[in-house]
From Swiss-Prot:
Homodimer, and heterodimer with other family members. Belongs to the 14-3-3 family. InterPro entries: 14-3-3, 14-3-3_CS, 14-3-3_dom_sf, 14-3-3_domain. The record marks R56, R127 as: Interaction with phosphoserine on interacting protein. It comes from Oncorhynchus mykiss (Rainbow trout). It comes from the Eukaryota. This is 14-3-3 protein beta/alpha-1. Keywords: Acetylation, Cytoplasm. Expressed in brain, gill, heart, intestine, kidney, liver, ovary, skin, spleen and testis. Adapter protein implicated in the regulation of a large spectrum of both general and specialized signaling pathways. Binds to a large number of partners, usually by recognition of a phosphoserine or phosphothreonine motif. Binding generally results in the modulation of the activity of the binding partner. It is found in: Cytoplasm. The modification N-acetylmethionine is found at M1.
Amino acid sequence: MDKNDLVQKAKLAEQAERYDDMAAAMKAVTEQGGELSNEERNLLSVAYKNVVGARRSSWRVISSIEQKTEGNEKKQQMAREYREKIEAELQDICKDVLALLDNYLIANATQAESKVFYLKMKGDYYRYLSEVASGDSKKTTVENSQQAYQEAFDISKKDMQPTHPIRLGLALNFSVFYYEILNSPEQACSLAKAAFDEAIAELDTLNEDSYKDSTLIMQLLRDNLTLWTSENQGDEGDAGEGEN
């Protein structure tokens, strides 16, 4: 199918909230090679974020049920098997995205902004894999996630404004990685606070087009900081970290 037709199909699928179809169309666009436009890049990201997000949410629900069925072997086995089925789907989706990133997207990115966007995405999808991994595979996915985030972070600090929504979104997700995956609340808070403070200091550089996106992510950074600080002081907090 022609690239423009595939993009149109992805937009239709998004309107219909059929994200698996949307992801398949944008995967086909990516596999045609060449650099994606900003619109195509965002369509790809939204599609897979919804596809993987549904499985992450399902996995959490079933994991919680599985823990609550201790003592009832039959129910626990059913829950475990269902969790493993969801886990396999989630892993396949992440591996699909990571293959697109490694084989096409990162290599074809010519602008710093695109490179940061895709490296952040790589960090995100290794983070999703690490959420369901254990043992050696967890260690590998965590290392790969941190490496991708760090590379993106270094480029963003060098080549992007502190108020740029992609730089802010990266700081948000990298700080969530420190908090949830590495269990390093101090580092998470330090990273989130620095990103927030740097953006506040340069509010006059806020681009009109991205004003809404940037301020929304700044709000999420601040919400996470409030939550994490209260949790570290021993208050009961809801661990629903905002991420981008």
